[in-house]
């Protein structure tokens, strides 16, 4: 990779971006079972998909028209991290008497602001690479790989770390871990290269912001078949 300076900075961003997710995504169910919310596991995971329907578009409009993407990335991670830490603190205080509505509300706020950051982090990376004259097609994939590395490292940390004989993967400490990493990335995001915002005549329509124009691709038989089998495999 050319220009190692920006590459390393974006590697760190991607590592932290997915480490946040890896801290609880595979282990949250075990904690919910331990506190008597095993029947609600599906609802917790479904919320990630629900907020992903509209939050990325809303945050994307803000980043596209009003505030630089790296700043929006930092703000979103700040809110998501604080909400996740609050969820962990509530789990600590409540012990085995966790109220579903309270924990779920805090968790939902966190994922509502986390899910848009996946696309935002890609936008920040593309902008940074282009600013330094690099090829996004060739130079971004090796950077993105470290997102997967971050996810795995965070997951393993939670799986093997324990306090008083209780593994993080079985307790609220996984939320603390995710939240702290989120706050670190929130601060780090503000140090990343500035991303341009759209000029007055370049604003996107609502259809473009929500990605609705992509459905036109399904007019092509090959794309429709690919999409159907992708859903079956996913």
Predicted regions and their residues:
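Hydrophobic core of transmembrane alpha-helices in multi-pass small-molecule transporters
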Residues: 15, 83, 96-120, 231-232
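Juxtamembrane intracellular "pre-TM" segments in multi-pass secondary transporters
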Residues: 1-4, 192-229
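C-terminal ends and interior cores of transmembrane alpha-helices
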Residues: 78-97
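Cytoplasmic helix-loop-helix junction between adjacent transmembrane helices
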Residues: 106-146
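Cytoplasmic membrane-interface "Motif A"-like loop-to-helix N-cap segments
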Residues: 64-78
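Helix-loop boundary and gating motifs at the non-cytosolic
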Residues: 1-53, 222-230, 234
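Symmetry-related core transmembrane helices of the 12-TM Major Facilitator Superfamily/SLC fold
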Residues: 172-191
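Helix-to-loop junctions at the C-terminal end of transmembrane segments
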Residues: 54-68, 162-163
């Amino acid at each position: 990779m050319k220009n190692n300076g920006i590459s390393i900075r974006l590697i760190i961003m991607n590592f932290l971006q997915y480490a946040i997710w890896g801290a609880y995504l595979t282990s949250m169910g075990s904690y919910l079972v331990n506190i008597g919310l095993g029947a609600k596991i599906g609802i917790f995971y479904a919320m990630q998909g629900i907020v992903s329907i509209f939050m990325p578009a809303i945050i994307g409009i803000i980043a596209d028209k009003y505030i630089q993407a790296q700043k929006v990335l930092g703000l979103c991670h700040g809110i998501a991290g604080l909400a996740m830490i609050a969820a962990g603190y509530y789990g600590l205080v409540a012990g085995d008497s966790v109220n579903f509505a309270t924990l779920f509300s805090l968790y939902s706020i966190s994922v509502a602001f986390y899910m848009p950051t996946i696309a935002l982090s890609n936008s920040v990376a593309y902008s940074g690479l282009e600013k330094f004259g690099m090829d996004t097609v060739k130079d971004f994939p090796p950077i993105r790989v470290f997102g997967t590395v971050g996810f795995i490292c965070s997951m393993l940390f939670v799986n093997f770390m324990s306090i008083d004989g209780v593994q993080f993967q079985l307790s609220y400490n996984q939320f603390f871990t995710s939240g702290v990493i989120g706050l670190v990335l929130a601060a780090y995001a503000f140090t990343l290269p500035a991303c341009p915002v759209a000029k007055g005549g370049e604003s996107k329509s609502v259809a473009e912001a929500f990605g609705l124009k992509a459905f036109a691709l399904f007019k092509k038989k090959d794309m429709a078949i690919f999409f159907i089998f992708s859903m079956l495999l996913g």
